[in-house]
């Protein structure tokens, strides 16, 4: 397992929870003896929704809402079996989406 690389991609709407989760993952991986690269901030995805304020007419009166998705990338270059085991047992907040690729 020494030649493999684990790529962890994190997504969340709140950047503070995302950074806390990334720090927790990096700390756990370093404690188990793996080499860690990251967290690397990826571009923030911004989705804008425009709706009409009025129900029937007044199309000039609109309101815009936006949703920002913050992303981070963590590469674990030389994972040990202990690293994989400790990452599986790691408890992270519910607002963070995690993708793990081996």
Curated annotation (Swiss-Prot):
Q: Which InterPro entries match?
A: Ribosomal_uS10, Ribosomal_uS10_CS, Ribosomal_uS10_dom, Ribosomal_uS10_dom_sf
A GO molecular function term, named singly, is: structural constituent of ribosome
One protein family per Pfam? Ribosomal_S10
Q: Any keyword Ribonucleoprotein?
A: yes
Question: Looking at the keywords, is Glycosyltransferase present?
Answer: no
GO BP terms in the entry: translation
Note the superkingdom of the native organism.
Bacteria
What GO cellular component entries does it have? ribonucleoprotein complex; ribosome
Q: Which UniProt keywords apply?
A: Ribonucleoprotein, Ribosomal protein
Q: Self-association or partners: how does it assemble?
A: Part of the 30S ribosomal subunit.
PANTHER family named among the record's database cross-references: 30S RIBOSOMAL PROTEIN S10 FAMILY MEMBER (PTHR11700)
The UniProt similarity line reads: Belongs to the universal ribosomal protein uS10 family.
The UniProt entry, under HAMAP family, shows: Ribosomal_uS10 (MF_00508)
Q: What does this protein do?
A: Involved in the binding of tRNA to the ribosomes.
Q: What is this protein called?
A: Small ribosomal subunit protein uS10
Lineage, uppermost ranks: Bacteria, Bacillati, Bacillota, Bacilli, Bacillales
